[in-house]
A protein has these predicted regions:
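Noncatalytic, solvent-exposed loop/strand surfaces
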Residues: 23-428
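N-terminal secretory signal peptides that target proteins for export/translocation
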Residues: 1-7
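Bacterial N-terminal signal peptides
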Residues: 7-21
Length: 428
């Protein structure tokens, strides 16, 4: 084969507080980008607090994920991701791929369409993490194909986000959202002023409602999250124009928080109770809003602090642990810790890896994946950044390691281009 090792960009995310409805049937599952509640925080406990010099035990590694930036969805003993030019196929097209969680064996691969070959070589490839719901899974290709598959790989329906829904991207890097499943609805972000957000029947793909945000620049790369404000369910999302809140029942645009035009808006928002934190890179920074109920099921957003460049994050994502935010400074490989309510930086430190860092959290620790292939473990504390282990991921270093890590059931799962690796991190 063909494609050297690639991993994840244009994806990001994070929330804390509200669960995503109807995305998993198993108790132990990671059914969409950044997990069941889209927090990037795993419920796992009893994990290693330090790693050996060469890293935790490698349980298995497998090939056949293809070129791509997508992370992993894990449900009912199966792992799903998106990639193109798989080492297990004889073409360069894009596929949704399924692996056995226990062994890493590839179970099936179903074609979605053409590969994404636009832009710099290291920015090409697949990028949307699948969303799994019961016996179905949903993917968005970079070209804007929204496809529903059965979990055995059979295609059920597809919609073209650009052609069918008038979608528009705010940049030239393709679509990468992981769609939201909420009850019977699939909710996605076509982007643009006509159909900024859309809700579809998850079983048939039929359009239920769309939301228009005047002069919206187009979809970014975030995956939306859910809030509940005074009895009103709100879908919170960011586009190329900034943050927005949409009433879940009918798609009514409730509020917007506009930002200046920037290169790309990638990280997903963080929701805790009535608070919304969102951030973007390229000098934009992070802001904190409070959602306030008004009347007749409407909600407004009030600014607690404005976009603060010190809180900027390009694509590695930010996690909220207790009352502090943790993320990479832009894409510099310099993790930061900040107070959620004030935005004040508590610490900022260089880690053992280099370049951009994506992270997840579990059991009071940060799992920091630097794009040069270094995987690090650090305690999630406002006191200081101190690593208690790091290792070089096999096969890394040829291209950026951008796929977000997943911690589930005592294991650390990493996507490294065509390879998926499983590590035992249980403290037993």
């Amino acid at each position: 084969m063909r494609c050297p090792c690639f991993s994840t960009i244009l994806l990001t995310a994070v929330i804390c507080g509200f669960s995503v409805s109807a995305v998993a049937t198993a108790e132990e599952a990671w059914p969409t980008f950044r997990g069941p509640e889209r927090t990037g925080v795993s419920p796992d406990t009893g994990l290693l607090t330090a790693w050996p010099e060469d890293g935790p035990k490698l349980v298995w590694s497998t090939s056949g994920a293809g070129r791509g930036y997508a992370s992993l969805a894990i449900v009912d003993g199966k792992i799903y991701t998106l990639g193109d030019g798989l080492s297990t196929t004889d073409d360069e097209d894009e596929y949704v791929v399924c692996f056995d969680q226990a062994t890493g064996k590839q179970l099936w691969a179903s074609k979605t369409g053409e590969a994404w070959n636009s832009g710099k070589p290291t920015w090409q490839g697949s990028r949307s993490t699948p969303t799994v719901d019961g016996d179905r899974l949903y993917v968005v290709t970079p070209h804007g194909q929204l496809i529903c598959f059965q979990t055995d790989g059979k295609e059920v329906w597809r919609r073209d986000i650009k052609e069918d829904l008038g979608g528009k991207k705010a940049d030239s890097w393709g679509y990468s959202e992981s769609v939201l499943i909420d009850g019977d609805k699939l909710v996605c972000t076509p982007g643009g002023p006509q159909h900024t957000m859309a809700a579809l029947d998850k079983m048939t793909g039929e359009t239920l409602w769309t939301t228009a945000r005047a002069e919206d620049r187009g979809a970014g790369h975030a995956s939306m999250v859910i809030a509940s404000i005074g009895g009103t369910k709100v879908y919170v999302q960011t586009t190329g124009s900034g943050a927005m809140g949409v009433r879940a029942s009918d798609g009514k645009l409730l509020w917007t928080y506009d930002i200046k035009k920037t290169t790309a808006v990638i990280p997903s928002p963080i929701v805790r109770d009535d608070l919304v934190f969102f951030t973007a890179g390229y000098g934009t920074g992070g802001a904190l809003l409070r959602q306030v109920p008004t009347s007749n099921g409407e909600v407004k957003a009030e600014e607690i602090y404005p976009t603060t460049p010190a809180l900027g994050n390009k694509h590695g994502g930010v996690v909220l642990v207790d009352d502090h935010l943790y993320g990479d400074t832009e894409d510099r490989g310099t993790p930061f810790c900040a107070e959620l309510m004030t935005g004040d930086i508590v610490w900022k430190s260089r880690g053992s890896g280099r370049n951009s860092a994506s992270m997840t959290a579990a059991d009071g620790y940060l799992y920091v994946r630097f794009s040069n292939g270094t995987m690090a473990l650090a305690k999630a504390t406002p006191e200081e950044y101190e690593e208690s282990g790091s290792f070089k991921v096999p096969g890394s270093g040829r291209n950026p390691s951008w796929a977000h890590p997943v911690v589930l059931d005592g294991k650390l799962y990493l996507r490294e281009g065509d390879d998926v690796l499983c590590y035992d991190i249980a403290d037993s």
